[in-house]
Amino acid sequence: MSDAEDIPTGRKRRPREQTPVQRALGLLVRREHSRKELTRKLTARGIEDEAAQAAVAKLTEAGWQDDARFAENLVRMRANTGYGPIHVRAELGTHGLDSEAIAAAMDSYEGDWQENARDLVRRRFGETGPQDLAQRRKAADLLARRGFDGDSIRRATRYDPDD
């Protein structure tokens, strides 16, 4: 036997256990999370509730996690993908945000919900919009499923290109 066979060629390192803060930061790097959502994900990954809350508090204090920033991004993202204010408000509620944070995020949106509804109808039914009653119903159903209010639905389905 030669000496070369006795030398280990590569040592395997055991992966180091991540701290709760590191795990939370790993989640935040991928996308924004609300405090409640981040805490829930950490506890689902086997981290104790107190440690998860402490990690989230530390990251919030450092500026890595911010419920207001999360809410504003979510409102903008959902509005740009064709969802209305009712849907967006409900989704923000499912992420554990309080009514004040939801109201602030909705107020920060600079777009026009009625124009978003019109754009969605234009994309689905062409530039001329829904032509007959059946198409108007389909357009209204689409907008209602997407979370637009009645006024926006009426204005979008009776679309006038000169408007």
Curated annotation (Swiss-Prot):
Main localization category: cytoplasm
A Pfam family the protein falls into: RecX_HTH1
Keywords associated with the record: Cytoplasm
InterPro entries: RecX_HTH_1st (IPR053926), RecX_HTH_2nd (IPR053924), RecX_HTH_3rd (IPR053925), Regulatory_RecX (IPR003783), WH-like_DNA-bd_sf (IPR036388)
Keyword tRNA processing: no
Compartments, as annotated in UniProt: Cytoplasm
Region (Disordered): 1-21
GO term, biological process aspect, one: regulation of DNA repair
Origin: domain of life: Bacteria
GO CC terms, sorted: cytoplasm
HAMAP family xrefs: RecX
Family: Belongs to the RecX family.
Chain's role: Modulates RecA activity.
Protein name: Regulatory protein RecX
Organism: Stenotrophomonas maltophilia (strain R551-3)
